[in-house]
Curated annotation (Swiss-Prot):
Citrate synthase is found in nearly all cells capable of oxidative metabolism. SUPFAM superfamilies: Citrate synthase. Gene3D superfamilies: 2.20.28.60, Citrate Synthase, domain 1, Cytochrome P450-Terp, domain 2. Its EC number is 2.3.3.16. It is an enzyme of class 2 (transferase). Belongs to the citrate synthase family. It comes from the Bacteria. One of its GO terms (molecular function) is citrate (Si)-synthase activity. Pathway: Carbohydrate metabolism; tricarboxylic acid cycle; isocitrate from oxaloacetate: step 1/2. This is Citrate synthase. One of its GO terms (biological process) is tricarboxylic acid cycle.
Length: 436
């Protein structure tokens, strides 16, 4: 971040309130729009800014992820998402997000070995699972168990020590697939499957999800490749609701396990992490291709309350760069599994075709997003809808941890404290109960 310059001069923005003016510096990032630094605004003019939901506010500096929603660009540490998804392993992306650069061979081998050594859970956590009902939602189990990890691994709770931060980061990223898979097994009444040192991150998750004690399990390479892609595509997405929650909690100095649990809780909200499940429900409700025109008409009717799920994005005003990769992956998975003429996929393709050619959606820039196809892929792989958001959390933990570390290590980091515009009652005097 640096001060913006125009014709050799530092750029400023003049803000006037009630006849008084103040010059606010304009800051430039590596990419993206400039921002106005308004930190001195209250002192100079006695006012705050009002931006509900922080939609137009940069709350932090970050070197991790860049999004250009107008152009459909997503970069991790400068690398386009399509290049990473096509060429990298998820472990490489973990290293990249945490450390800023892709690893060389020696670094990669050391890193993956360390990651593998942290996949096991404390044996007492098996007993912790028994406290949940068998019909508990897997996200409830995931959130509760991750939040409890600080009780099982208290040795790294002092985050002022860099080595502790690194240890906590590795533990969280390595253990969350195990917790997630065990949450699924617990709800199914099946025996827990332990992680294997001979499998990579994506393969291990599939093994712990679908292997059984009674027979050997061989990971399908096509499904492993698809899982690797899904993990990479969901690894980080800048300052979204759950990431901002992690940063807000982390700014208090809370232990990293509690911070990630807070992020999981935020992700659980249907407006954030449940979009791919909503797509499946929408397609099931449509039923068949012949019903699409009537459904589209309902979507256009503001009074119907019907929404087109899987299209449009809070940030992307162009095609979601992750959606094209998901579309390709969807076809690969269905072909590998021998699923032909899948009714949901046929519906999805036809719905996409109609929506992309309809002026109503084109003018509003409602393009398919990553959730449009991911739900179909996960369903085909045998992952139940109750686990969709859990898988999202597994992938996003890398981003959360990276963002948390970046925030903690930022010079001058302090507790986050948003302001408000108070619209309640003015000051008034207490009236005794008998006189009310």
């Amino acid at each position: 971040m640096s001060a913006s310059q125009k014709e050799g001069k530092l750029s400023t923005a003049t803000i006037s309130v009630d006849g008084k003016s103040a010059e606010m510096p304009v800051l430039s990032g590596t990419l993206g729009p400039d921002v106005i630094d308004i930190r001195k605004l209250p002192a100079q003019l006695g006012v705050f800014t009002f931006d509900p939901g922080y939609g137009e506010t940069a709350a932090c500096n970050s070197k991790i992820t860049f999004i250009d929603g107008d152009k459909g660009v997503l970069l991790h540490r400068g690398y386009p998402i399509a290049q990473l998804d096509e060429n990298a392993s998820y472990e490489e992306v973990i290293y990249l997000l945490l450390n800023g650069e892709l690893p060389n061979k020696v670094q990669y081998d050391t890193f993956t070995n360390t990651l593998t050594n942290h996949t096991l859970l404390h044996e007492q956590i098996r007993n912790f699972f028994n406290g949940f009902r068998r019909d508990a939602h897997p996200m409830a189990i995931l959130c509760g168990t991750v939040g409890a990890l600080s009780a099982f691994y208290p040795d790294a709770n002092d985050i002022a020590i860099p080595a502790n931060r690194d240890l906590a980061a590795m533990r969280l990223i390595a253990k969350i697939p195990t917790i997630a898979a065990w949450a699924y097994k617990y709800t199914q009444g099946e025996a827990f499957i332990y992680p294997r040192n001979d499998l990579n991150y994506a393969e291990n998750f599939l093994s712990m999800m679908f292997a059984r004690m009674s027979e050997p399990y061989k990971v399908n390479p096509v499904l492993a490749r698809a899982m690797n892609r899904i993990l990479i595509l969901h690894a980080d997405h800048e300052q979204n609701a759950s990431t901002s929650t992690v940063r807000l909690a982390g700014s208090t100095g809370a232990n990293p396990f509690a911070c990630i649990a807070a992020g999981i809780a935020a992700l659980w909200g249907p407006a954030h992490g449940g979009a791919n499940e909503a797509v499946l429900k929408m397609l099931a409700r449509i039923g068949k291709k012949e019903n699409i025109p009537a459904f589209i008409a309902q979507v256009k009717d503001k009074n119907s309350g019907v929404k087109l799920m899987g299209f449009g994005h809070r940030v992307y005003k162009n095609f979601d760069p992750r959606a094209k990769i998901m579309q390709q992956t969807c076809h690969e998975v269905l072909t590998e599994l021998g699923i032909k003429d899948d009714p949901l996929l046929d519906l999805a393709v036809e719905l996409e075709k109609i929506a992309l050619s309809d002026d109503y959606f084109v003018q509003r820039k409602l393009y398919p997003n990553v959730d449009f196809y991911s739900g179909i892929i996960l369903k085909a792989m045998g992952i139940p809808t109750s686990m969709f958001t859990v898988l999202f959390a597994v992938a996003r933990t890398t981003g959360w941890v990276s963002q948390w570390k970046e925030m903690i290590e930022e010079p001058g980091q302090r507790i986050s404290r948003p302001r408000q515009l108070y619209i309640g009652a003015p000051q008034r005097d207490y009236v005794p109960l008998a006189k009310r």
